[in-house]
Amino acid sequence: MKVAAGAAAAGPLSAPSSARPTIPGGLTVPGGSTIPQPPSRLARDSQLQRQIRFCRTPAGVRIAYATVGRGPALLVPAAWISHLELWWQDPAYRAWFAPLAGVRTVVQYDRPGCGLSEPWPGRQTLGTELEVLQAVADHLELDRLDLLGASMGAPVALAFAAAHPARVARLVIYGGYADGHRIATAEVRTAMIAMIRAHWGLGSDVLADVFLPDASTETRAHFAQLQRGVASAQFAAELLEQCYEIRVDDLLDQVVAPTLVLHRRDDRAIPYRLGRELAAGIPGARLVSLAGRSHFPYVGDAAAVVRAILEFLGESVATPSPGQPPGTLTARQLQVAALVAEGLTNRQIAQRLGIEERSAEGHLERIRQRLGVTSRAQVAAWWARDAADR
């Protein structure tokens, strides 16, 4: 895998560089919005240290991408609005990727005009998405890769797999669709785009409720603020419009890579029926139906999603056994430990992760057993010390 360093740069959809606002840490954001800080300072796990670098598309647009982990490449197309640095500060988001990064080099990127990537000179389309994905893959000299397409990244991954059958080894689709027109009625689609364009504050709140119905009120509010901070109303409206316009249903039968389709049955953003139809159109694809309403995989039963992906990739699930050293925690246990370190109660942890309070209690008890400690304070101390330094 080739890696090349570059100079940091980010910008709004149309404002000149001199107009770009900044936040502490030197992050540039679009539209003059203020980025909220995370609820508390988060400890870092050395196994999840990412490297952010930059490459250029054939059109000369600079794209920010991040790599983390080890092993063969797992390329993850942009799913929605993103910011490589800010999203990684979420302990639940970071912990969800931990098992994947243990067996794959996970590659993510910010789409043009979003996060740390430069804006695209014109309206973005599926062709734009494919050009960016290929630019990242070519820059890293990935002749063979696995793809994980989630949400809006799903049709992009599908189209790339259809166009490059010799390059894609395995394809995972989560919460995906093949025809954006079928996500909602024309009236709903038009109303959503108009609301976001005219009232981005309300629109970002509505999207947070749709994407994260099982998360706590605090988590949804924080995510809504992040959306407003890293994307302008115009950018968000155009991106949602693009989401609704994308169609790749005529390409499904051209996908030859082994394909796993994961979809939560009560997904509030992308209806389950679209995942089922998508799987039916891909030769030999396997459909796995999951419980839950949240669209994002790291909320709700995140472990079930990771487990299915690892099994499909031919990797064992990283679950501690009696022979493993103390301090080895599952992805879910790492999430709980991080939230304990934030000072959250079991009830608050359950609300944040979209699980039952008794499940949070059970996770905490197993964490204490694995770490050989007896109190929440000791768990928090372990997270602040060992997870940051080992």
Identify the role of each PLM range.
Residues 54-118:
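Conserved HGGG/HGGXW glycine-rich cap/lid loop of the alpha/beta-hydrolase fold
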Residues 127-145:
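Conserved acidic catalytic loop of the alpha/beta-hydrolase fold
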Residues 158, 162, 168-198:
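Flexible "cap/lid" loop of the alpha/beta hydrolase fold
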Residues 201-246, 251-252:
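Conserved alpha/beta-hydrolase catalytic His-Asp/Glu region
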Residues 255, 261-263:
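Short beta-strand/loop motif that positions the catalytic acidic residue
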Residues 265-270, 295-296:
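Acidic catalytic loop of the alpha/beta-hydrolase fold
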Residues 285-324:
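Catalytic active-site module of serine/aspartate enzymes centered on a nucleophile-bearing elbow/loop
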Residues 320-365, 369-370, 378-390:
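Helix-turn-helix DNA-binding segment
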